Design a protein with these regions (language model features):
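Class I SAM-dependent transferase core
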Residues: 1-63, 67, 97-100, 104-113
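Conserved glycine-centered beta->alpha loop in an early N-terminal alpha/beta scaffold
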Residues: 70
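S-adenosylmethionine
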Residues: 87-90, 94-225
Length: 225
């Protein structure tokens, strides 16, 4: 596992390598009791979860206040935090069991982050969090219009929503309305990967989000913008 990590992730320190190994062990152990990931083979986890999560590293300035919406088993936030402990991260998930897992990971790895159990739609309306982040990450399996409605309201004006995607050429066409309504502009950054097309869609928030968004829980996915 260590050799695999060192071959795959550039500039990996011994301490960070230890943390990735511990994270993998926790992931596989907890996955026997709850559904965290279908990917459990070491090589697959290192490439498709750990290394893939790190694609956003160049776009996160030191110390930026960052939120990971629908973090699930901790991707991309935990790998990013292992490499960049300076990040001020908030991890949001709708399932309490996953939040408990994330808190255990952070404690075991000696990392600091805030974990919140909430639906993304409700979190985006909470005045403590709305329009308060510099960056919003999402690697969740949802269409771009849905991800934008759940992430953009959390950003300060000038902040960036970073969505992890595959081939987005068709999805970008369907996201035009969401980009317009949420006052965003999008840039697609290809990500090098040997397991299929990967990209980051980086959306910059250019004006405050209208009060109507995000809509009530379930609506963004039922009726995408």
């Amino acid at each position: 596992m260590r050799e695999l990590l060192q071959q795959t992730i550039p500039n990996l320190t011994g301490e960070a390598c230890d943390k990735f190994v511990a994270y993998y062990e926790l992931l596989v152990d907890w996955n026997t009791r709850m559904n965290l990931t279908a990917i459990t083979e070491p090589e697959e986890v290192v490439k498709k979860h750990f290394a893939d999560s790190l694609a956003a590293l160049p776009y996160l300035a030191p110390g930026v206040r960052t939120v990971d919406v629908g973090t699930g088993a901790g991707f991309p936030s935990i790998p990013l935090l292992i490499m960049r402990p300076d990040l001020k991260l908030t991890l949001v998930d709708s399932l309490q069991k996953r939040v408990t897992f994330l808190e255990e990971v952070l404690k075991t790895l000696g990392l600091s982050a805030q974990c919140v159990h909430a639906r993304a739609e409700e979190f985006g309306r909470d005045p403590r969090f709305r329009a308060s982040f510099d960056a919003a990450l999402s690697r969740a399996v949802a269409s771009l219009p849905v991800l934008l409605e759940l992430t953009v309201p959390l950003l300060k004006v000038g902040g960036k929503a970073i969505c992890y995607k595959g081939d987005v050429s068709e999805e970008l066409k369907t996201a035009k309305s969401a980009l317009h309504l949420l006052h965003c502009t999008a840039e697609v950054v290809p990500v090098e990967a040997d397991y299929g097309a990967r990209s980051l869609v980086i959306c910059t928030k250019n004006a405050p989000t209208p009060a109507a968004y995000p809509r009530k829980p379930g609506m963004p996915s039922k009726k995408p913008l």
